[in-house]
Amino acid sequence: MRILSSDFISKYFGKILNIHPSLLPKFPGLNTHQKAIESSEKIHGASVHFVTVKLDGGPVISKETVSIDPTDDVTTLAKKVLQKEHILYPKVIQWYTQKRLKLIDESTATLDGRVL
């Protein structure tokens, strides 16, 4: 993971997408799978969001979920989430390249003109 400077983010406002291994706004930052397990979550997943100055705080575009089984550990949960990420990110990138997505401000994005 790399944290981008606010100058860089401002220069490319609305042009940077990030995939994050949690159902944002839950568990921003690192160690998301461990945090989900320790919090006794039943559902976990991945989110794609526009990058803004606030870490993992930009508008969420789409999410995919997985169930957390009692036998899951960090490794098995990470594998489940990664499978969903491989579906989710290409879908959102396609929307972006089709110019269907737009970042309005630090907290608002649209898909096909509808606020997300």
What are these regions (language model features)?
Residues 116:
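Phosphate-binding loop/pocket of nucleotide- and phosphate-handling active sites
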Residues 1-112:
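Donor/substrate-binding cores of folate-linked one-carbon enzymes
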